[in-house]
């Protein structure tokens, strides 16, 4: 599978062609991997597969609230901020302008993974960070915790954030008071002044917040020295990558469609666009250069924290999925809520993202079930509704219409080809394809790199 089709770069056109309108711009196409549910679908595994022959792997949104796990040579690496494709020594990793960066978190993550195995050796020389990416400060994280506490006290429930400062830093960005990587590396005196103003704003909003401004600035100066060689103009970097020699460029989405700030189950969402539009805005590239868009789907559904979950099984079935699937959040360690596959939500995610193919992961977790249910429609007041209610109170009231399929009651973890799967497992996959009208390209039947069955 080729990542990138190549068209002649504008600079290579003869002068006589300058005035002629061109139907499509030239350049390489990026391959995008996106979560199609509420996260934790196994995106890291798909990225790891595709990154083996990639040249550049990018992150375009989110921060270290995301959690991707990749297993290579029996070593389990955990990624939160770094693109997980960085474990390929030939890959250049790029963190785009749409990502928010907590510098202590970045270095801590890199050091932890360096100690685990050889995958991250020389990572500093292979990482490029957009100069337009915003910085998450410790007080953003502290404010995140205070906000959650206030929500709990005032409304009796919180949003279930990871307390990584993601909401507050995107709020600073939208309020135009945030600070970016370019500010840190270009003019530390100017950066310091703006940092003091922002810190004092936060102290006035949250009186209990303690900020050691001088101490923080001292730490940030140390990080500035380390990070400076990695910071570049991201727009120019990516333009050169798209319009230079053929390159395989991969974009690794964080979070997932139903956590998108606009299209997710608001307000129980993240603070960035984790759908395909976030690729263009978070990297600074035109939509014409988006190639394949792969949606990653778990064979059942999980969700961390609170919020609507129509197919949730708060019973023995949910418990069995939770224990068999070892469903704990990579970032928070929280137990994930579990339920049947929801095709209504997947159709909605496809409407927004236009998936060209799917990766269906964790099919082996369903091995124990004699019958498997799949959500195929929503009813409200006894009537089938053709859409997903945007309002959470209404979404909580929908009744799911299920299709029941026979299980396979067989261990499929050693299957390495589609034809090696039991007929009922094959039928489950084909049913999903037929309902969604999207081909399934990969099927995951275990944790290792080898346990991804490729269909075409």
From Swiss-Prot:
Binding annotation for IMP: 40-43, 65-68, 162, 176, 255, 270, 334
Keyword Mitochondrion tagged: yes
InterPro entries: Adenylosuccin_syn_GTP-bd, Adenylosuccin_syn_Lys_AS, Adenylosuccinate_synth_dom1, Adenylosuccinate_synth_dom2, Adenylosuccinate_synth_dom3, Adenylosuccinate_synthetase, AdSS_2_vert, P-loop_NTPase
UniProt cross-references to PROSITE patterns, sorted A to Z: ADENYLOSUCCIN_SYN_1, ADENYLOSUCCIN_SYN_2
The keyword Metal-binding is annotated on this UniProt entry: yes
Subcellular location: Cytoplasm; Mitochondrion
Binding-site positions, Mg(2+): 40, 67
Name of this chain's protein: Adenylosuccinate synthetase isozyme 2
